[in-house]
Amino acid sequence: MTLPVTAFVAAICALLLLITAIDTVRQRLRVQAAFGDHGDAKLISASRSHGNLAEYAPITIILLGLLETARANHMALMIVGAIFLIGRVAHIAGLYAKIEPGKAPVPRQIGVVATFGTLLALGGWTLWMLATVNL
């Protein structure tokens, strides 16, 4: 396969999207909500876990693919991809955790830091590759 790191991360994201989509549908059926969330905490958690992954996965996969195509170090790319995936799983778990008023659950915090760190690393790395390799 030409882009194995990108393919691996994309495949895991696809599975996570499917899992979160199925749970969102289950929650919608439970509260009989075709549209909106009806203020139901479980439906909100399910739909946001799916939506949040759908928001961050595409740019991460694109950046991984660009870097892999530019022959960036595969081991480093796999580590960054793994951090992203671990962060996404943590974020999903955090959205389902019991909420203390005014404080995000620790898994959600880990997920946010991992996701933002991944985007910063991949974005910076891509710009660095553009500035140094393609001159």
Predicted region positions:
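Interfacial loop-to-transmembrane junctions
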Residues: 92-118
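Juxtamembrane helix-capping/reentrant segments at transmembrane boundaries
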Residues: 37-51, 103-112
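Short alpha-helical packing/oligomerization segments
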Residues: 65-87
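Membrane-embedded alpha-helical transmembrane segments of multi-pass integral membrane proteins
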Residues: 13-16, 20, 64, 83, ...
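Core segments of transmembrane alpha-helices
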Residues: 52-64, 119-120
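N-terminal signal-anchor transmembrane alpha helix
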Residues: 3-33
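Juxtamembrane boundary at the C-terminal end of a transmembrane helix
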Residues: 123-135
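Cytosolic, membrane-interface loops and tails of multi-pass inner-membrane proteins
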Residues: 22-47, 98
